[in-house]
Swiss-Prot record:
Lineage: Eukaryota, Metazoa, Chordata, Craniata, Vertebrata
Biased amino acid composition, Basic residues: 169-188
Official protein name in the record: PHD finger protein 23B
Species per Swiss-Prot/TrEMBL record: Danio rerio
Listed GO MF terms: zinc ion binding
Zn finger limits (PHD-type): 258-306
Subcellular location field: Nucleus; Cytoplasm
Record note on domains: The PHD-type zinc-finger domain is required for negative regulation of autophagy.
Length: 315
């Protein structure tokens, strides 16, 4: 039993010795240089080093050089490899410095290229200026369109207001249109004759004489037309006066200033009608009666009111 127990303890000790981890490896200058070169290559500052092998962890050694008895060989190998690693580390530092200088130079050249790629900044500024100019032009066009709309609206209102004035002007100038047209025709004929012929003196006098004669004839014709119109108007007025003789009061000296209407105004030659009940003469305008629609029986408003009041009392 004791032998079995001792064997079991020996096996446990062997397992523990095998499973015990070695001391944690410490970073060296070579590892730092490799790490820096890897970072620079990853950032595209330096070209990637394909000729170098993968980064393999080298055997490390404690700085004191003391360790367990079972690990003596490992420590011895690490101490033997220290001197070449330091030499290689100094060369790697030199290469890192050169790579950093190259990277800075490349960086500055790239920045210069970015700053001036065939006048890109000038092109951008020109594009911005053209964009702002197009915006200003569009704003100016909008303002012009608004002004044109306002002017069109104002002209429409002016046309609507001036249409009435044009109609009135046409009515006013319709009487003198014949004279002006005839006078213009005579002037044009006289000018054409005077320009076509050589003897200007006698012919101008003749043309002026003709113009005067024609103007006089036209005036006489117009006077005759006006007289005919006045005669027609007087005849029509006479007919109306004849039709109104039964309605109107006789126009004597006393009856002209006679006041019989409720409005308190005199007769003054205006047409009147007599009430069939109270025999009071009332102006047709006060009774609101047209000359064309004169009734045979007329009752003034006072007689109408008295009738209505009597009917109400009876009811």
């Amino acid at each position: 039993m004791l032998e079995i127990m001792s064997e079991h303890q020996d096996s446990l000790l062997k397992c523990k010795a095998e499973t015990l981890p070695s001391e944690r490896r410490k970073r060296t200058v070579e590892d730092f240089n490799k790490f820096c070169s890897f970072v620079l290559a990853y950032a595209n500052y330096i070209p990637s080093q394909k000729e170098e092998g993968p980064w393999s962890p080298a055997s490390s050694s404690s700085p004191n050089g003391s360790g367990a008895s079972g690990e003596g060989s490992v420590l011895g190998g690490a101490s033997s490899n220290m001197s070449p690693s330091w030499n290689h580390g100094t060369s790697d530092l030199h290469t890192i410095h050169t790579f950093v200088h190259k990277a800075r130079a490349n960086k500055s050249s790239k920045s210069m290229r970015r700053l001036s790629p065939d006048g890109a900044l000038e092109d951008n500024m020109c594009l911005k200026d053209s964009f702002y100019e197009s915006q200003a032009a569009s704003k100016a066009e909008r303002k012009k369109d608004k002004k044109l709309k306002r002017l069109s609206l104002g002209s429409g209102a002016g046309d609507s207001s001036s249409s009435g004035g044009e109609k009135r002007a046409r009515i006013k100038h319709s009487k003198n249109s014949k004279q002006s047209k005839a006078y213009k025709k005579l002037k044009s004929s006289a000018h054409s004759e005077s320009d076509s012929e050589n003897g200007l003196g006698h012919r101008e006098e003749r043309s002026e004489h003709r113009l005067q004669v024609q103007v006089k004839e036209e005036k006489n014709e117009e006077d005759e037309e006006e007289a005919i119109r006045e005669a027609d108007m007087s005849s029509s007025e006479g007919e109306t006066w004849i039709a109104d003789e039964d309605i109107m009061v006789e126009s004597g000296d006393d009856s002209w200033d006679l006041i019989t209407c409720y409005c308190g105004k005199p007769f003054a030659g205006r047409p009147m009608i007599e009430c069939s009940q109270c025999n009071v003469w009332v102006h047709l305008s006060c009774a609101k009666i047209k000359k064309s629609n004169v009734p045979d029986i007329f009752n003034c408003h006072k007689c109408r009111d008295s009738r209505r009041s009597s009917h109400k009392k009876d009811s």
